[in-house]
Amino acid sequence: DFVEKSGERWYYLKMDVEKFFYRMDHEVLMSIIRKKIGDKEAVRFLEHYVCHASRAFGLPLGVKSPLEISDKEMLWDVGIAIGGGLSHMYGNMYLNPMDQMAKRKEGIQYYIRYMDDVIILSTDKELLHRYKNMFSDFLGDVLKLRLNNKTAIRPVSHGMEFVGYTIRPFDVRLRKSTSLRMKRHLKTIQELYRDYEIDLDRARSTLMSYKALMDHCDCRALEKKIFEDFVLTHNPKEADTENG
């Protein structure tokens, strides 16, 4: 709201780290962990998870997906397993030095980060260009990462894509890709319930989690359509088999 009410032309810098989880450097990560955690047993446990995994998770620079290369070409000294609570914890710890530089050294007021997605707001477009170059150098020199081609500076009025939403001064909507992914997942949930592979509580909790996602944006028509289409039925043949 403050952007809309200010009457000024606002811009945003959207920074996205290239293949973040696949490119996290093990030495850099463990150095950060050792500075933050004093318990040696805990550090050894975390180091085992990071440095002694049963398989390699690192991608060479320029490779977009693990599907593009063989297991032998995956890198052992970078990358961590995605999923579970530890990967998100590692991700936040890894980029904390960047947060500290932004807030404490540079004093950037409108700095927002969720994992490797970063938004900075300003009325000064040239300042955002300076920030872009500064963070690009910091990521490369200190964290051994680089920004991808989604990194851009645009007017806020054009809409910012962030954490599954398109955010404008006057409204917030689900990104089209988020909406399509949600519809596909809910269709899968219906199929799993129909075939007795999940129970009612699981199906209902999935639907309600998406309702919470939609509650934060302007998509009442979409929400109404989702609830109308989400009908749970059991496969009659499966029911007959169970009764027999």
Q: Model features per residue range: what roles?
A:
Residues 104-110, 143-147, 220:
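Surface-exposed helix-capping loop/turn segments at secondary-structure junctions
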Residues 37, 136-144:
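A common structural junction motif
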Residues 32, 138-139, 159:
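Residues within well-ordered alpha helices
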Residues 24, 49, 139-142, 234:
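Prokaryotic Sec-type signal peptides and long signal-anchor helices
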